[in-house]
Amino acid sequence: MYVVLEGIDGVGKSTQIELLKSAFQNALFTKEPGGTKIGETLRHIALHENLSELARAFLFLSDRAEHIESVIKPALKEKKLIISDRSLISGMAYSAFSSLELNLLATQSILPAKIILLWIDKEGLKERLSLKSLDKIENQGVEKLLHIQQKFKTHAYALKEQFGCEVLELNAKENAKNLHERISAFIQCVV
C-alpha cells in the first residue's frame, strides 16, 4: 500500500515520518523530490539553479517518474507498505504548472491509496516559521504558503473524487503524539 504525507513546509511532516519509522519498521520510507540518486541531483538543480518555472516543473516530473519506476513500483510488486514524504500532490501544489495529466504520465497512473494531509492556520504557520531558518519557498511569505496549502487540499480531494484515494486531513497544531496515533490508525486500517 502506498501512503503519502502531505502539507506545506512547517506542518510537521518530518516529525511524523520519524514517529512512523518506529511504528512501521518493515515499511519502505521514501520522499519526493529526491527519493533516488538521480532524484537528488534533479532536486538540487530544481531548487538551486536559476530556471524558468516550466523547466523546474519538468525536472520535478522527471524526478517523480524515476521515483515511481525505481522505488514505488518494485515495492508495490512486493506488497510492501510504502510511506512517502510528499508525492505528486506537492508537485501540483507548489508548481505554477499543476497538470494532473502530466503527473499521471509521470506516475504511470500509480497513485497513493492513502493521503495524510497536515494543515495549519495562519497564526500557527507564523509561529512555526519564526522558529526556523527559511528556505526559498518559505521566504515567499505566509500568504503565499497558505495559498499553496489550499492547493494541497484541492488536489488531494480531487484525487479522492476521481480515483478513490482516501484522505485524512489533520490540524498540524494538535500535539505530535495525538497526530501520530491518528495517522497510525489510518494506515493500519488496511495493513
Curated annotation (Swiss-Prot):
PROSITE patterns attached to this UniProt entry: THYMIDYLATE_KINASE
One cellular component term from this protein's GO annotations in UniProt: cytosol
Keyword check for Nucleotide-binding: yes
EC numbers on record: 2.7.4.9
InterPro entries for this protein: P-loop_NTPase, Thymidylate_kin-like_dom, Thymidylate_kin_CS, Thymidylate_kinase
Reaction catalysed by this enzyme: dTMP + ATP = dTDP + ADP
Keywords linked to the UniProt accession: ATP-binding, Kinase, Nucleotide biosynthesis, Nucleotide-binding, Transferase
Residues given in the record as ATP binding sites: G7, I8, D9, G10, V11, G12, K13, S14
GO MF annotation terms: ATP binding; dTMP kinase activity
Entry-linked CDD domains: TMPK (cd01672)
Bridged cysteine pairs (disulfide): none
BP GO terms, sorted: dTDP biosynthetic process; dTTP biosynthetic process; dUDP biosynthetic process
Function as written in the Swiss-Prot or TrEMBL entry: Phosphorylation of dTMP to form dTDP in both de novo and salvage pathways of dTTP synthesis.
Similarity comment: Belongs to the thymidylate kinase family.
Name this protein carries in UniProt: Thymidylate kinase
Native organism: Helicobacter acinonychis (strain Sheeba)
